[in-house]
C-alpha cells in the first residue's frame, strides 16, 4: 500500500488507476482485450474524490416524478378532504415507485388511510420497478400493460390491478406480465394480476391477499396470514 501511495484500504476504493493489466497470462486471447476504459480514472489522477461520501446530500430529483408532477396535485382534495378522485395517466418503465409518494401523502394526512377506492388511477403502459410500493388503504392503481420487478412491494392496504391489454395477441394465463419479487413484504391490501408473475412472488407476505395466474420459482415463501 505504501508503494502505491495510499495509507488505508478506504483510500484504495475506486482507484482503478492503480491497476495494471498483467502480461503474465498464457492463453490464446492474450493482448486482445483492451481494459483501458475500465482502468483509466482521470478523477483519481487529478486527486479528486472517487469514493461515495455518505455525508453528501442526496438528490433523487423527486420533483421530476409523476407522483410530484401529476398525482399529488390531482389528488389534493382526496388527501385533505377525502373527496373521491379518478383519472387516467400513461406510465413508462422508467417511472419507478409510481404511487409511493402519493401514498405517503395520504398516510401523512390520514393515519388510517382513506375509504376503499377513494382514489382510483387508471394507468396504461409499462410500469417501472416498485410500481405501487407501500401504497395505503384508499388508493387503487389499475394498470393495463405489464410491470417490472417489485410490483406492490410492501403493499400497506392499497389495491393493485394489473391487466393484460385486450389486443395483446397472447393468452394472459400463459405469459409473464409482472417481474420478480412482486408483493415482497406486503402486509395488507389486495392485488389482482391477469397473467403470470416472475420469481419469488409474494415472499415474506404477511397479510396482503392476491390472485395471480401463475408464478415462477420460490413463490410464496415465508408467507403468513394471507390468501394467495
State what each model feature region is.
Residues 9-61:
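Terminal amphipathic helices with adjacent charged low-complexity linkers/tails
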Residues 105, 124, 134, 142-146, ...:
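Feature marks extracellular polysaccharide-active and adherence modules
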Residues 110-112, 129-135, 147-155, 180-183, ...:
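Short, T/G/N/S-enriched strand-turn elements that build extracellular solenoid repeat scaffolds
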Residues 158-182, 206-208:
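Acidic/polar low-complexity surface segments
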Residues 181, 186, 191-192, 205, ...:
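Conserved structured catalytic cores and adjacent interaction surfaces
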Residues 226-227:
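Conserved small/polar residues in nucleotide/adenosyl-binding loops
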Amino acid at each position: 500500500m505504501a508503494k502505491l501511495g495510499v495509507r488505508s484500504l478506504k483510500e484504495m476504493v475506486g482507484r482503478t488507476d492503480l491497476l495494471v493489466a498483467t502480461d503474465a497470462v498464457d492463453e490464446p486471447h492474450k493482448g486482445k482485450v483492451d481494459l483501458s476504459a475500465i482502468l483509466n480514472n482521470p478523477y483519481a489522477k487529478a486527486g479528486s474524490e472517487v469514493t461515495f461520501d455518505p455525508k453528501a446530500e442526496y438528490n433523487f430529483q423527486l420533483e421530476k416524478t409523476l407522483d410530484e408532477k401529476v398525482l399529488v396535485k390531482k389528488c389534493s382534495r382526496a388527501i385533505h378532504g377525502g373527496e373521491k378522485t379518478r383519472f387516467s395517466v400513461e406510465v413508462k418503465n422508467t417511472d419507478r415507485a409510481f404511487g409511493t409518494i402519493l401514498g405517503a401523502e395520504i398516510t401523512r394526512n390520514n393515519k388510517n388511510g382513506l375509504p376503499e377506492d377513494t382514489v382510483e388511477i387508471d394507468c396504461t403502459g409499462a410500469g417501472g420497478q416498485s410500481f405501487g410500493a407501500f401504497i395505503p388503504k384508499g388508493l387503487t392503481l389499475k394498470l393495463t400493460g405489464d410491470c417490472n420487478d417489485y410490483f406492490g412491494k410492501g403493499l400497506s392496504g392499497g389495491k393493485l390491478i394489473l391487466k393484460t391489454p385486450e389486443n395483446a395477441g397472447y393468452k394472459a394465463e400463459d405469459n409473464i406480465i409482472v417481474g420478480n419479487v412482486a408483493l415482497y413484504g406486503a402486509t395488507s391490501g389486495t392485488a389482482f394480476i391477469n397473467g403470470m408473475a416472475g420469481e419469488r412472488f409474494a415472499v415474506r407476505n404477511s397479510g396482503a391477499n392476491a390472485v395471480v395466474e401463475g408464478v415462477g420459482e420460490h413463490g410464496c415463501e415465508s408467507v403468513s396470514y394471507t390468501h394467495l
